[in-house]
A protein has these predicted regions:
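Flexible, charged surface loops at secondary-structure boundaries
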Residues: 1-4, 54-58, 79-80
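Alpha-helix N-cap/loop-to-helix initiation residues
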Residues: 16-17, 71, 93-94
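Glycine-rich, N-terminal phosphate-binding loop of Rossmann-like dinucleotide-binding domains
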Residues: 12, 65-66, 90
């Protein structure tokens, strides 16, 4: 079983009250490689929050913290990462992308 699964957290925030912040911290605690992507530069602990569409290889999981309207600009990016799975967190469910 592979323990270090690269995860892209899309909709990352440096606000400790946001679920995306907690997700990054939890993933790092369990030694996963995390790529945090948000709309503002910043950090979650030692993890930088990147903006735009950072190129990544070997992505296991994309976990979404963006509502469906905001996801639209990332459709091609998400698919280009070729993740093994996409996690739609509560409030992010999107029939168009899940197909």
């Amino acid at each position: 079983m592979e323990l270090n699964k690269k995860t892209v957290v899309l909709g990352a925030s440096n606000n400790p009250e946001r679920y995306s912040f907690l997700a990054v911290e939890k993933l790092k605690k369990y030694h996963h490689t995390v790529v945090a992507v948000g709309n503002k530069l910043g950090n979650i602990g030692e993890t930088p929050i990147l903006t735009g569409f950072p190129a990544e290889q070997g992505v296991d999981t994309v976990t979404l913290y963006l509502n469906p309207v905001l996801q639209a600009q990332y459709y091609q990016y998400i698919l280009s990462l070729k993740p093994k799975r996409i996690i739609f967190n509560p409030g992010t469910e999107n029939a168009a992308l899940s197909e």
